[in-house]
Amino acid sequence: MAISDLLNRRVRALPEEDEEIYSEESAFEEKSDDRRSGESDSDSDDLDDEALEETDDNSEHDGPVGLEDDEDSEDGEDNDNGEDDVQASLSSISFGALAKAQASLGPKGKRNAKTAKPTEESPQTTSPLDDIRARIREAREQKRQESGKSKDSAKPARTSKHAPMVQSSKRAVSRKRTVVEPPSVPKSRDPRFDPTVLSHGGRHNAESARKAYSFLDDYRSSELKELKAKFAKTKNAEEKEALKREIRSTSDRLRAMENRRREEEVLAEHKKREKQLIREGKKSNPYFLKKSDLKKQVMLKKYENMNSKERTKALERRRKKIASKERKEMPMERRLGSEGNDDGGRKRRRMA
């Protein structure tokens, strides 16, 4: 049991970091030790068989046995006894003791690095895993180099000269940050578009805005009078045409503003009347005017504010407008027939 004592003496503690590293190599070395032990067992069996055959051969011969044969037989017996003792001691050692002894020697790579010198003549054997890793590394490096070359060689170009230019939308974020906000620069303010003015008037309260800017109506009416006077004095045809267009646009603008004001007045009166009826209990729900009813009431209010002469002119103008509209909607034969009735009752025939 001398070998087991020696192995147990050489056992030492290992750090926890090397357990995973030693596991693979320890398994590999255990396999190799098993193979070696198997080979040694087979060799010992072969030697025993040969020794038995030799003894049988010697026994078959009738000649005397010499002193040399006795000495050889004694030496063989001693060797056999020593090998038997070694095998018995090895078989009695537990696997845990063998693993500890193997781990105490350290990993195979570290032992080779410590014992082997760089000037050794024997080349180091490389595992197939290292070869595969080296090949993968080389393939990745080649692929990276090829991709870098392709990126450098490929220049951004348009498909045709008429195609729009392609530009990346990515922009680098500036490293500068505004720590202190600069003072705001005062800007010129137009009261017509000022939000403070529009919040008090404008869309929320059109009536107050109209009262606040009522002086603009006087300016527009005076401007229209000046344009008409200038149109009467000028004699140039081009200037007359330009003044005529300007007078027409100004008068249309004033007329549209007047119509809008009239609509608002009609709506205000209607709402006031409906509220009064609801307050008196004559109605439970208010009645909202339709666009057609609103248009009729606005037209009546417009004619009520006119004098007799203006009213007759406006009615004649409206009658002609409606007649021309109806004539356009009539078919061509009826339209020509109505025109023929004016010429002595003769009807014009359409030539095919």
Swiss-Prot record:
- Entry-linked InterPro entries: RRP36
Task: Give the top-rank taxon of the lineage listed in the UniProt record for this protein.
Answer: Eukaryota
Bias category Acidic residues: which stretches? 16-27, 40-57, 67-86
User: Which keywords describe this protein according to UniProt?
Assistant: Coiled coil, Nucleus, Ribonucleoprotein, Ribosome biogenesis, rRNA processing
Transmembrane intervals: none
GO biological process annotation, one example: maturation of SSU-rRNA from tricistronic rRNA transcript (SSU-rRNA, 5.8S rRNA, LSU-rRNA)
Q: Which GO terms describe its cellular component?
A: 90S preribosome; nucleolus
Give the Basic and acidic residues compositional bias ranges.
Answer: 28-39, 130-155, 304-315, 323-337
Where does this protein reside within or beyond the cell? Nucleus, Nucleolus
Task: Look up keyword Coiled coil and say if it applies.
Answer: yes
Ranges in coiled-coil conformation: 221-280
Annotated segments matching region Disordered: 1-207, 304-352
Q: Which family does it belong to?
A: Belongs to the RRP36 family.
Per the entry, what this protein does is: Component of the 90S pre-ribosome involved in the maturation of rRNAs. Required for early cleavages of the pre-RNAs in the 40S ribosomal subunit maturation pathway.
Quaternary structure (record)? Associates with 90S and pre-40S pre-ribosomal particles.
What is the official name of this protein in its record? rRNA biogenesis protein rrp36
Protein species of origin: Aspergillus oryzae (strain ATCC 42149 / RIB 40) (Yellow koji mold)
Q: What is the gene called?
A: rrp36
